[in-house]
Curated annotation (Swiss-Prot):
InterPro entries: CAP_dom, CAP_sf, CRISP-related, P14a_insect
Pfam family, one: CAP
PANTHER family (alphabetical): CYSTEINE-RICH SECRETORY PROTEIN-RELATED (PTHR10334)
Residues with glycosylation annotation: N146, N210
Family of the protein in this entry: Belongs to the CRISP family.
Protein name: Venom allergen-1
SUPFAM superfamilies registered for this protein in UniProt: PR-1-like
Superkingdom: Eukaryota
Keyword Glycoprotein belongs to the record: yes
Protein's cellular compartments: Secreted
Main location: secreted
Length: 256
């Protein structure tokens, strides 16, 4: 089994008949074209003929959210040698972010898009992961949970000093998926997942998760302080250390 995980930014396109924004609006993207602008609705050639979206039903959403929040709570409570977080929100699901993620996922190419912003979230971030295997009966929920844990495991290589200021450059193993996962200006996530067959027998799962905030160079990953001390809506009784699901934070740069 081969595993690859990666994190970055992504965003997407318009729902037919919905009130979502025009993703071709140049004001949404400074860094390049929006992934959802005039995006094709069909699957990409790399997906082959045997491909499908994994249904993002309530069970799979719950697995993704619970895994994210369990791991965020570990950092908020000061585990793994990291300082406690004063205001780490509970992640909740966002359908627009998930829809936008589908435009990356449907390409079946493991690569970040250049822009995935929405009207509300102008600094949207992204994590990607893919696995290819043969001869195993892995389920989508198991893969999603494993992917999220692999992102989090990058904490082993992340210097604690990065909590105060995300670096402009980093030498060594990847740490960006972990820092994206525990960013305290992120409070929503939406994901899309593809299942496709290559070379006649190789099974692939490709997961794309979009977040309300990305890593910002020179800015804190999260604000240090006594666990939950700055939560404005109290703490989450299920994921102790996180702010309640009602907590709303500004997903924007400190520098405007």
């Amino acid at each position: 089994m081969a595993f690859n995980g990666i994190a970055l930014l992504i965003t997407a396109t318009i729902f037919i008949g919905s009130c979502y924004a025009n993703y071709c609006d140049s004001s949404l993207c400074r860094q390049g074209p929006h992934v959802a602008c005039n995006a094709p609705q069909q699957f990409g050639p790399a997906c082959g003929n045997n491909r499908k979206f994994v249904p993002m039903d309530s069970k799979l959403k719950t697995i993704i959210l619970n895994t994210h929040n369990k791991l965020r709570a570990e950092i908020a409570n000061g585990k793994h040698g990291f300082p406690q977080a004063a205001r780490m929100p509970t992640l909740v699901w966002d359908d627009e972010l998930a829809h936008i993620a589908s435009f990356n996922a449907r390409k079946c190419i493991f690569a970040h898009d250049k822009c995935r912003n929405t009207r509300q979230f102008k600094f949207s971030g992204q994590n990607l992961a893919i696995t290819t295997f043969y001869g195993f009966n892995f389920q989508a929920g198991d893969r999603a949970e494993n992917f999220t844990q692999e992102w989090f495991n990058e904490h082993k290589d992340c210097p604690k000093s990065y909590v105060d200021a995300y670096p402009s450059s980093h030498r060594g193993p990847q740490i960006g998926h972990f820092t994206q996962l525990v960013n305290d200006r992120t409070w929503k996530v939406g994901c899309s997942m593809m299942h496709y067959i290559t070379n006649g027998k190789m099974i692939n799962y490709y997961l794309v998760c979009n977040y309300t905030m990305t890593n910002m160079i020179g800015e804190p990953i999260y604000t240090k302080g006594r666990t939950g001390s700055k939560c404005e809506t109290g703490q989450n009784p299920q994921f102790k250390g996180l702010c309640s699901p009602r907590e709303r934070v500004k997903s924007e740069s400190y520098n405007g």
